[in-house]
């Protein structure tokens, strides 16, 4: 995991080179998809486009830092099972017991490592496009609600879980 000077974890999810065909030949451009998190529950993603790779990465990282959201975590995993959807992409995320690790691939793994989840089971269904999988993962994570928040919404007292 690559950490910057602010203690944020930066992960490059996808780097793409695109070509625009012009009269004189091909003009290349780059796009970068980056996930940034503090490994304590905050995570954001950004897409940057530029003529050079470092500039695309810088733009993506800046956008990711600007759009960070807080995710409620419970003992290094998710509080409950969720389904995130975006476009054709659907990501299923399940909490896992301690010691399981991050069982996920590609974009989902990058998000989980950046957010600070240590144990999770995930499956991406419908598409393997990194953009859509990443957005579906983020849609699922942002829909998570903590037990305290739900009890406050319902006007009830939070009780200890039954064993």
Swiss-Prot record:
What would you give as a GO molecular function for this chain, any one? structural constituent of ribosome
Q: Per the record, a Pfam family?
A: Ribosomal_S5
GO cellular component terms? small ribosomal subunit
Q: Which InterPro entries match?
A: Ribosomal_Su5_D2-typ_SF, Ribosomal_uS5, Ribosomal_uS5_bac-type, Ribosomal_uS5_C, Ribosomal_uS5_N, Ribosomal_uS5_N_CS, Ribsml_uS5_D2-typ_fold_subgr
Query: Which keywords does UniProt give here?
Result: Ribonucleoprotein, Ribosomal protein, RNA-binding, rRNA-binding
Q: Does the keyword Repeat apply?
A: no
Alphabetically, which GO biological process terms does the record hold?
translation
State the source organism's domain of life: Bacteria
All copies of the S5 DRBM domain together span 8-71
This molecule's function is given as: With S4 and S12 plays an important role in translational accuracy. Located at the back of the 30S subunit body where it stabilizes the conformation of the head with respect to the body.
Per the record, the domain comment is: The N-terminal domain interacts with the head of the 30S subunit; the C-terminal domain interacts with the body and contacts protein S4. The interaction surface between S4 and S5 is involved in control of translational fidelity.
Oligomer and partners: Part of the 30S ribosomal subunit. Contacts proteins S4 and S8.
Q: Which family does it belong to?
A: Belongs to the universal ribosomal protein uS5 family.
Spell out the protein name for this chain.
Answer: Small ribosomal subunit protein uS5
- Name the lineage: Bacteria, Pseudomonadati, Thermodesulfobacteriota, Desulfovibrionia, Desulfovibrionales
């Amino acid at each position: 995991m690559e950490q910057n000077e602010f203690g944020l974890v930066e992960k490059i999810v996808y780097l793409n080179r695109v070509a625009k065909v012009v009269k004189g030949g091909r003009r290349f451009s780059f796009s970068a998809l980056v996930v940034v998190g503090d490994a304590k529950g905050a995570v954001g993603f950004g897409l940057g486009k530029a003529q050079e790779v470092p500039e695309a990465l810088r733009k993506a990282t800046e956008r990711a830092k600007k759009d960070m959201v807080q995710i409620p975590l419970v003992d290094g995993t998710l509080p409950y099972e969720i389904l995130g959807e975006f476009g054709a992409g659907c990501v299923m995320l399940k909490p896992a017991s301690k010691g399981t690790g991050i069982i996920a691939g590609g974009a989902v793994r990058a998000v989980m490592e950046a957010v600070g989840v240590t144990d999770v089971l995930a499956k991406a269904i419908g598409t393997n496009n990194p953009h859509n999988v990443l957005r579906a993962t983020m849609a699922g994570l942002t829909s998570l609600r903590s037990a305290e928040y739900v009890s406050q919404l319902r006007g009830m007292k939070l009780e200890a879980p039954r064993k």
